[in-house]
Amino acid sequence: VKDFNLPQIVLDLIGEDGEKTWTWADQSFFGLGGYEADPGPAWFAASVEIMDMFTLYMPTINHLTGESTGSMTLDIDGNFSVAPTGRTGTFTYDFDDIVPNWSVGKLKVTAPILYGTAIALVGEGAAPTYLPTEFFIVKCDANNLVLAAPAEEGQALYPWAACTFWCFKPKP
């Protein structure tokens, strides 16, 4: 273990050795829930099959193909990469920018995260909306990373406003 002299929450995000790979949580790992209210996708959780269907039939997100079973690696230098697509970008975090009783900080990225499309309820289903570059960090500890973003770009945020959630666990 290297000593980076960083707060524990940062080490939880990027790993004790300066690099950490996150993969999808075991269940309810991508979907919709409420801003300031839900800890994850409480309203709608997409399956791998639904995520794959989105990438197959929605040309705006077909570059995310394969990411429904992929992973994302973050490092101490602020770089991230997504497998299996190989997309790379940079990230910054701010653990002082919180939503009381709901989020522990914010994450900003220069490229889409793992399966980085937001979704919104449309009719009787859900559909991709935009590729967020700023996320609420709803939970970050050694075993969980939960990110959320407004379901639609530019939407007003108020309690229970629709948010897309991404839920990760460390890759073994």
Regions found by a protein language model. Name each.
Residues 2-23:
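N-terminal helix-cap/turn-to-beta initiation motif at the start of protein domains
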Residues 18, 24, 68-70, 76, ...:
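Residues that flank catalytic or metal-binding motifs in active/ligand-binding sites
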Residues 26, 110-113, 148-153:
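Short, flexible beta-strand-to-coil junctions
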Residues 29-36:
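Short, solvent-exposed loop/turn elements at domain surfaces
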Residues 37-55:
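Short, flexible N-terminal segments of the mature chain
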Residues 51-142:
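Contiguous, well-ordered beta-strand patches that form the walls/edges
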Residues 144-160:
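Short, exposed beta-strand-loop hairpins at the edges of beta-sheets
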Residues 162-172:
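Short, low-complexity, Pro/Ser/Thr/Gly-rich segments in the mature regions of secreted, periplasmic
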